[in-house]
């Protein structure tokens, strides 16, 4: 294989890795918007909290002498999902339910206030400095090599791909075949009609926040291990990128969030490799603007029909 092709292949691996985590976070945005038509701008902080919870659990278990990587990560996942889900439920109860029928601006201010509160809460309790995470997966597989360059897949990248696939598969099965999943789809189609048909819409909305928070927690664990460092402010940019992915794919569409996340991740990786790392954010948001100019509802978004 040529060196140029191997370099391109490596960037594709990196882009799919990053895009997979964006897709996980984007699901929370797209599910909440699909049902109540609001954006949860505190969602990125839930991702950040998931990272911190997994770090504390893994560090505690390592101090107890447990050093099996898969066991440590599994414990981190379970703890992060439980705590982040509780935060997601609390955000819906405190920041959204009281203002659900108010003007959109009030809900937006409430969400931003919750985001700032969570950032500062973690900063005060855990400190504002970067925290280094223990590296649990250090292996790699060489896919191809030339005289000066080799393309490889790290064990952590493979873990991210597998976990993301399983999480997406579980969510798809839940939405399509479970009773609560069908209730979520009914509420996304017409919230008022679903309420008239006897569906407990408050419970469905709360469940939507919980599912989104759980997905964000999974992404928090994965990205924490991938980058090896976390701080109380990582949620803001990750949340903005995931929101961009959701809009890019068509906000309100779960497959759209998946596609948007992968496109955004690949675009960032390629721009970092062939232009400069300083341009990756510019390229990401420019791509969003370009897509919205051509397809205002995103790649898989449906145009809203005004009912009269």
Swiss-Prot record:
Positions on the Periplasmic side per record topology: 43-45, 92-104, 176-203, 267-280
Membrane topology: Multi-pass membrane protein
GO MF assignments: L-isoleucine transmembrane transporter activity; L-leucine transmembrane transporter activity; L-phenylalanine transmembrane transporter activity; L-valine transmembrane transporter activity
Primary location class: membrane
CC terms in the record's Gene Ontology section: plasma membrane
Subcellular location(s) per record: Cell inner membrane
Transmembrane spans: 22-42, 46-66, 71-91, 105-125, 155-175, 204-224, 247-266, 281-301
Cytoplasmic side: 1-21, 67-70, 126-154, 225-246, 302-308
Pfam families on file: BPD_transp_2
Gene Ontology process terms (BP): D-alanine transmembrane transport; L-alanine transport; L-isoleucine import across plasma membrane; L-leucine import across plasma membrane; L-valine transmembrane transport; phenylalanine transport
Keywords attached to this entry: Amino-acid transport, Cell inner membrane, Cell membrane, Membrane, Transmembrane, Transmembrane helix, Transport
Keyword Transport: yes
Function: Part of the binding-protein-dependent transport system for branched-chain amino acids. Probably responsible for the translocation of the substrates across the membrane.
Family per similarity comment: Belongs to the binding-protein-dependent transport system permease family. LivHM subfamily.
Protein name (record): High-affinity branched-chain amino acid transport system permease protein LivH
Organism, as annotated: Salmonella typhimurium (strain LT2 / SGSC1412 / ATCC 700720)
Gene from which this protein is expressed: livH
